[in-house]
Amino acid sequence: MATIYIALVADVVASRGLPTAARARLQRRLLSAIPDFNRRWRKALAARFAVTLGDEFQCLLTSPAPIWEIAHVVRTTLGEVDWVIACGRGSLTTPLAAGRTAPELDGPCFHEARGALETAKRKHRLFGFGGFGAATTTLNAFASYYSALYWSWTPRQRRAAKLLRCGDPASVAAALKVSQSAVSHLARRMAWPLVSAGDSIFHAMLTDPHSPSAGPVS
């Protein structure tokens, strides 16, 4: 019997194109955010968040349930760049001891996540999935829809989308320094009710108890 986990790997889109000062600033902000991420999702973590490369980080989850929330908190907290969030489902080949961070571990779940990350980058997706059995194709189809919609928006609309996915209109208005009516107008132009409906289905695919999730398998 092997225990199945979800490895999550996040990386910045086109980070090498960032100016040196901007990339250094992002890396500092990421390092300062990691302790908050570990506190916020401590009950869902099999192994803690940690930075692997300069602007890439990993964590190991016991189930896929927090993926949606993690992705959108990251996109909002570190919203000056775009992030690819890749998830791989599988087992570990290294011992899992208390206090270990995700980059200290290895196994099929991480291989699946790494492959999903490379495919997502190649196909300009903001999500990538591997190892989820029959659900993998559907999850990546939703990732394609989500990403195509995002890239079709203007930079201002993209920022609004990040905020709307994590907050209410009042907080979005404060962040954008506009009125709530301006936020409503922007949301209408983005067909936000349809976007939200699509998001709900995508989210449900990740959290549905009947979908593949962490647990013992033979």
Q: Where do the language-model regions lie?
A:
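Regulatory and interdomain segments flanking nucleotide-handling catalytic cores
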Residues: M1-S218
